[in-house]
Amino acid sequence: MSADKLVVGVVGMPGAGKSVVVNAAKAMGYGIVVMGDEVREEAKRKGLEPTPENVGLVMLDLRRLEGEAAIAKRCIPKIWEKPENKVIVDGVRSLAEVEEFKKSFPKFVMVAVHASPEARFNRLFYRRRSDDPKDWQIFHERDLRELSVGLGNAIAMAEYMLVNEERLDVAKRKAVEILRKVEEKWMR
């Protein structure tokens, strides 16, 4: 466990393309922690189907019962367990989570990924993960739920922004460029 561990939080609306940054980071030797996995695991422990509604309710319930930074607190030990000295955290949702990560990791930086609602809906619709929306109404409800926990604030406060409206290869190249800038700044 090194106090010098670089931790990069990735924030973005569902379907924005956070996984592009995560995959680029993985190829660059980062350990990976996915915050949504913690919520999906909790839903499974409660015996709930991993639908968008159930996963969303579990996310809100965890924050209500354990505080706004509940999921970040649950992920911190997983970050420390990673053998890599640089770790990407996929799915930061609020400034409370950002502050929680900063308490544990002095080298914590945020990368936001942005894409239009139409692009995001299409990506989620065709990805077909169990908690992805099946129609526009469910997509819109999920967006509002995510924004209600402070996702927009976390996006606004990110140090780096990747706009993901182009081809996948362009987004991958942008992600690598951003991660190199982060490393240049934080891993001297």
PLM region spans:
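Conserved lysine of the Walker
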Residues: K18
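A glycine- and Lys/Arg-enriched "phosphate-lid" helix/loop adjacent to the NTP-binding pocket
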Residues: P52-L57, E99-N153
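Small-molecule kinase domains that catalyze NTP-dependent phosphoryl transfer to phosphate-bearing small molecules
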Residues: A69-A70, Y126-K181
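ATP-dependent small-molecule kinase phosphotransfer cores
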Residues: G31-I88, V92-E99, K103
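Well-ordered beta-strand positions
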Residues: G31, V109, E159-Y160
